[in-house]
Amino acid sequence: MIDPMLTIIIPTHNRAEILGRCLEHLSEQTFQDFQVIVVDDGSSDKTQEISTSWSFRFPHFKYVYQKNQGQGNARNNGLKHATGDIILFIGDDILLERTAVQGHMLMHKKHPEKRIAVLGLVLWHPEVEVTDFMRWLTSGKDGGTQFAYDLLEGKEEADYNFFYTSNISIKKKLLEKHKFDQDFHSYGWEDIELGYRLAKEENMKLYYNKNAVGYHHHMIDEKSLADRMRSIGKSSKIFHKKHPELKKLPPLWKKTALWLISRKPVLMLAKKYRKNFYYYALSKRYLLCGLRQV
């Protein structure tokens, strides 16, 4: 059997139900010449059962189990089994539009050189009730911390800060020397850090294809912000140690400013009158906590 052109790698942990829907959407793609690799990062639910039940829908399918070591390690593990010349990373809660994979492949056909990566668009799934908090999360101009696709409006290229592994494809040759750094154990920065290394050392060029759409089927509430931002804070210190030239950590004056805007009186006023600023200030309160934890 001839190896497929593309390998799709999906790291997952205890989300069997949505993983099944993710695989269902892959089975409906207009472009089908791909290998699917599900990397189970130590799940205790029915992830293996769901994966096996869908494996018969794909000529090239592999289920890989590992002890819980995080998404970056899971993606690296998936790469060991990848046979395609192009790698597409997606999240287990990303439901791709029928033409999304084709959109990635057309862009790679247009730009066949080895140093190319393609960023697809991620939107909230129509079934998900999008709250004010979730809208802020995906608003780059308001300091949201999930995605910042609004900053790419009208653009065809993006820099390493947009190396989002929820929906991104890349030539496998680019990843022969560069893997996800396993020093990142908490949420945040491990994908951006890889993107930076690829841009710096391999001159990676990241194209943006807004027509390669994936829908994020994941309800996120405000209660998760504390853990999310503390993790980002811890990871940002690791990032800074590796790449101090980027100055990703806020200087003392900015830490002081962030501390001031995240005091309770300011938060109370912002919550009442300026919701996006409230979420931004609250996120910085937890970020500062994370910076102190490392």
Predicted regions and their residues:
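Conserved donor NDP-sugar-binding/catalytic core segment of glycosyltransferases
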Residues: 99-134
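Acidic donor-binding loop at a coil-to-helix junction in glycosyltransferase catalytic cores
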Residues: 187-194
